[in-house]
Design a protein with these regions (language model features):
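Glycine/serine-rich phosphate-binding loop and adjoining beta1-alpha1 elements at the start
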Residues: 15, 26, 32, 106-186
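Conserved small/polar residues in nucleotide/adenosyl-binding loops
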Residues: 1-8, 361-368
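Adenosine-phosphate binding glycine-rich loop
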Residues: 142-162, 166-177, 292-363, 367
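An N-terminal-biased, well-structured beta-alpha scaffold segment characteristic
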Residues: 15, 21-130
Length: 373
């Protein structure tokens, strides 16, 4: 199926108007249903802004409850509460949530409807096909952050803390304390990837006193991090050989590398686990199927760890969901400008005004979809 960016108002469906009066829409906030997902993509503050702009806001009951936002707060902000996701999909022009669409949602998508959520198309081909088949307009929320995703920052920081929890003896780990104690050495931690996630993890682990090595393929990033931390961290180029060299003395590895789809190699294969001491920890924050860690398989907050070759693996896919209040506030603040641009000006005009928004825009070819409003 062909996918493209719409560049003509004559080929854009619902919400394509170029002024506020024409493009008033019904905004729908779903309750996320992914296992262990407690975040919301819009707090009552964002709902109040959307209503003040002249739009109708529908909120599914319980959408923000696990993140600390009660239904009554959404009502006070001007939202109308509805009971089911079917109510949202059936009435809203613009539908949003945090995580990917679940298969039970595929039949509810409709032509011309605007969907703003994480899609991760490389890992979810069935979801992509459902979007194409429905004729809806989808925006990939995971790509919408100009200055780095607050969820990536949260995943790095909280992932580091989850790794430290996994290191506890009661969880199968070595039982080492991060900064060490009088007469006992600090943990040695290896961070793979020096991007937003890796830097966030580094900030926590360094502050807590771990001895940290960061690996990346970009020597410029490594130089910058060395300067930022006054030469108190180690850096190396990220190669399988360098990783193997460090693993025998490493207590915890954090994988923060976004692995290219279709790559048939690993940074840490199963045989390399034997280089690590019993009770060592791997935290796979990137969480890519067929990714950098061969022994990876996805886990949940309810059952977050497994042990393979004596190494504790923590592989929860939605780590930021564990700090739902903070991540919801940060995430919602980062996406509300996109929401307002689309709601107030329509899809076409919003994309014309902000070329960055075009990068998130996914839909069937214009010739397959006619304007519905």
């Amino acid at each position: 199926s062909e996918m493209c960016i719409r560049d003509s108002p004559n080929t854009v469906p619902a919400g394509a108007g170029t002024d506020l009066e024409e493009s008033n829409m019904v905004f729908g906030l779903l309750k996320d249903i992914k296992n262990g997902e407690y975040r919301t993509i819009a707090t009552p503050a964002e709902i109040a802004t959307i209503v003040a702009d002249g739009h109708t806001a529908l909120v599914q009951r319980g959408a923000g409850e696990k993140a600390g936002f009660e239904d009554q707060e959404y009502e006070k902000a001007g939202a109308r509460l509805v009971d089911t996701m079917e109510d949202i999909y059936g009435q809203a022009d613009f539908v949003t949530k945090v995580k990917e669409l679940e298969p039970c949602e595929f039949p509810l998508l409709r032509k011309g409807q605007i969907i703003f959520t994480c899609i991760h198309p490389a890992a979810h081909p069935q979801e992509v096909q459902a979007i194409l088949d429905s004729g809806c307009i989808a925006f990939t929320a995971e790509d919408c952050h100009r200055y780095g995703s607050p969820n990536c920052e949260a995943a790095g920081k909280q992932g580091a803390l989850m790794g430290l929890e996994s290191m506890l003896s009661i969880n199968g780990g070595k039982g080492k304390f991060v900064s060490g104690l009088g007469g006992a050495p600090a943990m040695r931690v290896l961070i793979l990837g020096g991007g937003t996630v890796g830097q966030a993890a580094l900030s926590v682990l360094y502050a807590l006193g771990a001895r940290v090595t960061v690996m990346d393929i970009n020597i410029g990033i490594l130089r910058t991090l060395k300067r930022q931390y006054q030469e108190h961290i180690d850096t190396m180029l990220c190669t399988k050989e360098n990783i193997a060299q460090l693993l025998p003395d490493t207590d915890m590895v954090l994988n923060c590398v976004k692995w290219p789809k279709g790559c048939n190699d690993f940074l840490i294969d199963r045989s390399m686990l034997k280089l690590m001491g019993k009770g060592s920890v791997i935290v796979d924050i990137s969480n890519d199927d067929n990714g950098a860690i061969e022994s990876f398989h996805e886990t949940t907050h309810e059952n977050p760890r497994y042990i393979e070759e004596g190494v504790v693996h923590y592989c929860v896919s939605n780590i930021p969901g564990a700090i739902a209040n903070s991540t919801s506030i940060a995430y919602a603040a980062s996406v509300i400008p996109h929401f307002r641009a689309i709601l107030n000006h329509g899809v076409a005009e919003a994309c014309v005004r902000d070329g960055f928004l075009c990068l998130l825009y996914t839909s069937p070819s214009p010739r397959d979809t006619e304007r519905s409003r």
